[in-house]
Amino acid sequence: MDEFHRYGKEDSSWQQCFLYPLFFQEDLYAISHDHYLDGSSSSESMEHFSSNDQFSFLTVKRLIGQIRQQNHSIVLFLNCDSNPLVDRNKSSYSESVLEGLTLVLEVPFSIRSKYSVEGMNEWKSFRSIHSIFPFLEEKFPHSNYILDTRIPYSIHPEILVRTFRRWIRDAPSLHPLRSVLYKYRNSPENFKRSIIVAPRVNTRFLLFLWNHYVYECESILVPLLKQSFHPRSSSHGSFPERTHFDRKIKNIIRISRRNSLKSIWSLKDPRIHYVRYGERSIIAIKGTHLLVKKCRYHLLIFWQCYFHLWSEPYRVCSHQLSKNCSSFLGYFLRVRMKSLLVRTKMLDELFITDLITDEFYPIVPIVPIIGLLAREKFCDISGRPISKLYWTSLTDDDILDRFDRIWKNLFHYYSGSFGRDGLYRIKYILSLSCAKTLACKHKSTIRVVRKELGPELFKKSFSKEREFDFPAFSSKAAARSQRERIWHSDIPQINPLANSWQKIQDLKSENGKLNLFDQ
């Protein structure tokens, strides 16, 4: 792979004769088959795979022979199963071929994304949920509007092939891709005659299509936004929030003048803030109400011009930071003004300056989370805890571990937000629901369960020290968390309860059918 990267950096003409021969390498399909089994075993139970699903090099050779005969749809579908992208448990041969196709296309894509991102003025596309938390900590001294955008994920297969054709000169390597996409588009389960690419799918092939599609969108959209909202630089001799800027030293540039020994500090003063996770993105900009309407209109035109698809107007919503609140990844996002008093003394006079900046104020949606707990049978509609009858067949340790993981993951996800006192109401619901579940299992009361199992049992599972990941400084972290916002780094993805609530909010906005110029 290092040699591929070296060739790609020196000369991109190697792509003209490199990709297509990889389809005839038997080892590639063996590797892809191992990747397929590893991914399937992690996401699906092994009971779905029978002993007859064995990998045969003889079948692979036949598939390669049919690829040489240009019968791509026969290779990928007819000899394996009728619809491999929908029912992937019927046979693993089609998935192995798709994995091999994905491995071949990932080689130039990884090289292109690596070197093109380096040349985009240090712009990096956010790929992890951990990149959301610095965005929530950012200051917005100039932005007064946000655009909440949901990237459309229904796209025509030929548009995807054309996006690949822009940077892959090896045209024969795209024939299998075109066959796969059109076969999937013509499947009976697909009524829209388009490809659904989204980050929530599990197949590696569709995930690769999604990453490529989003990369193409951002590589075109981000430079346009940066040209429209050009950042300015302001020079300062000293900063009132020097501690805050030192923690974000990468945004400060030291400029030395040639004819002077003095040096000044130039702070990047951006007029645009952008963050994306999955199909949701937020753009914070500065402008008038008319300018925001135009920007919203151009975003909708962008999908039509570059990808020939119609994006519904409700997928791009605009909100004024000082008046409205929005939902993003399970948080209520509001903006509050933060004032800072600066005292400046000049000779015998003392000046007091009040600097006001805007910052995000993420709030925990307590009431919606309690409603989701009621839907999952942890409590009733009023928030009164009830027993989880489906878990009474489990052991006591499994029941305690499940309730503890729900609480710990929920607390860690909202650890850096405001209004965390309401989380302890959710803790009370979960702990009492756990006690009632154990009492229902042993056919006794909560008092008897506490007496038999001991009071230390619930303290071990729902202890306050387990809410923090600082073993040596747990007491200090607990005291500091009441004053500061601490984001935990063990959050792999959006919390399931928060994700369910976010989907409900998206459905409400979709059913509302917001007009293009309503906001």
Curated annotation (Swiss-Prot):
GO terms for cellular component: chloroplast. It is found in: Plastid, Chloroplast. Transmembrane segments: none annotated. One of its GO terms (molecular function) is RNA binding. Belongs to the intron maturase 2 family. MatK subfamily. Signal peptide: none annotated. This is Maturase K. GO terms for biological process: mRNA processing; RNA splicing; tRNA processing. It comes from the Eukaryota. Usually encoded in the trnK tRNA gene intron. Probably assists in splicing its own and other chloroplast group II introns. The gene is matK. Keywords: Chloroplast, mRNA processing, Plastid, RNA-binding, tRNA processing. Its main location: plastid.
